[in-house]
Regions:
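Conserved, single-site charged/polar hotspot
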Residues: 2-228
Length: 228
């Protein structure tokens, strides 16, 4: 894979209206050629006392196109014998994760309760292009899942006193975006392999599979998204 220029997708705005419900407008929706884009819309019913209004959602750019901070390097296998550390006894595929929508220390950032599969689909749709070959999509999605399950298994943030599973900051974790458009081929692959992860011989925990784009940021020893 090579970096695409110019912009490899079009952007659209979708407005959804229904009587008795608050309207929703989603802007900056990515649409790629020959790939079905899926946009979830959740509408809130209006109370009698409420006036009609519109919820505005702006989808951030894909990390391959936008400007985001690079990942701060960490050990791919976390120590699990430290006194007082919280760690699960076995690898568990969670039904839900709690996503902190910002850096760990940002107390103003909102926390979202997200189904694990939906979280992976969101991150993959935020981090890679849906037009890439199937084998490339699978490799990247597997890395995303292993990273996520390492955070779950080690209870990384809860062990530091936080009440969430993972953040949406690319400096610490992976990009997750509220209202993100999901792509049908990415959704299908996640449904097929959602309980898979990478590990090392004699290592029980999923490894923290860190990666970078390989163009704007280089990362020796990590997977690069361009060229994967």
């Amino acid at each position: 894979q090579e970096p695409d220029r110019p912009q490899p997708f079009s952007e659209y705005t979708v407005t959804v209206q229904a009587e008795g419900y608050r309207s929703v407008e989603v802007s900056a929706i990515d649409v790629f050629a020959n790939v079905t884009a899926l946009q979830e819309i959740r509408m809130e019913p209006l109370d009698i006392s409420q006036k009609e209004g519109t919820e505005n959602i702006v989808v951030p750019p894909n990390t391959l196109w936008g400007d985001f901070p690079p990942k701060i390097p960490e050990d791919e296998v976390k120590p699990v014998n430290e006194s007082g550390e919280i760690v699960l006894s076995r690898v568990v595929i969670p039904e839900y994760v709690i996503v902190h929508d910002g850096p760990p220390t940002d107390t103003r950032a909102q926390d979202y309760y997200v189904r694990y599969r939906d979280y992976i689909k969101n991150v993959a749709s935020s981090e890679i292009y849906s037009t890439w070959p199937e084998a490339t999509l699978r490799a990247n999605i597997l890395a995303i899942m292993s990273f996520s399950l390492n955070r779950v298994y080690t209870e990384w943030y809860r062990g530091k006193g936080y009440d969430f599973t993972i953040t949406s900051s690319t400096a610490y974790d992976q990009k997750w975006s509220f209202g993100r458009t999901i792509f049908s081929n990415i959704s299908r692959i996640v449904d097929e392999i959602f309980n898979h992860y990478l590990s090392r011989p004699k290592v029980q925990q999923p490894i923290l599979t860190q990666y970078c784009d390989g163009k704007n940021v280089t990362c020796s020893g990590w997977m690069t998204q361009w060229g994967s």
